[in-house]
Amino acid sequence: MKKISHIITVMIAALTLAACNNAKVPGDYSKSESLPAIYPDYAGTTIPVNIAPLCFMYTGDATDMVTQIAYQDTEILCSGIKAVPDTDEWKELLNKAKGNKLQVTVYTENNDVWTQHKPFAISVSPDSI
């Protein structure tokens, strides 16, 4: 039983990472002035530069989600109802954004219609924990 549980966990992790690597920002979408319904809600928070990747999930009605986490010309894209940034990409992004803000933009799909939610910022402290 433990072996099956371990195999399932590894498969889910692999699929999640693959989803982040193949993500694309939708080409056609409407804009919403509302922040995305995510859990945990990281909007407006400050994080240390050496924190592990922040994962979150969309809690509203949607069949898919694309998350764009960016600072200047560096970005991470994840797809799926749960955003799970790649650890190496996350570390690189935080080091570049140290002392500045990340911009997070969430796109959700419902009934084949994409919506771009109001982007939010996450401040990156230059201090480590």
Language-model features and meaning:
Residues 16-19:
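C-terminal motif of bacterial Sec signal peptides marking the signal peptidase cleavage site
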Residues 25-36:
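Proline/serine/threonine-rich low-complexity linkers at boundaries of modular beta-sandwich domains
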Residues 59-71:
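Solvent-exposed loop/turn segments flanking beta-strands in beta-repeat/beta-sandwich domains
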Residues 39-62:
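Contiguous beta-strand segments within globular domains
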Residues 96-110:
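Short, aromatic- and glycine-rich surface loops/edge beta-strands on solvent-exposed regions
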Residues 21-23:
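Bacterial signal peptide processing site
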Residues 81-99:
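Signal that preferentially marks extracellular ectodomain short beta-strand elements
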Residues 38, 117-129:
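Low-complexity, Pro/Ser/Thr- and charge-rich linker/hinge segments at domain boundaries
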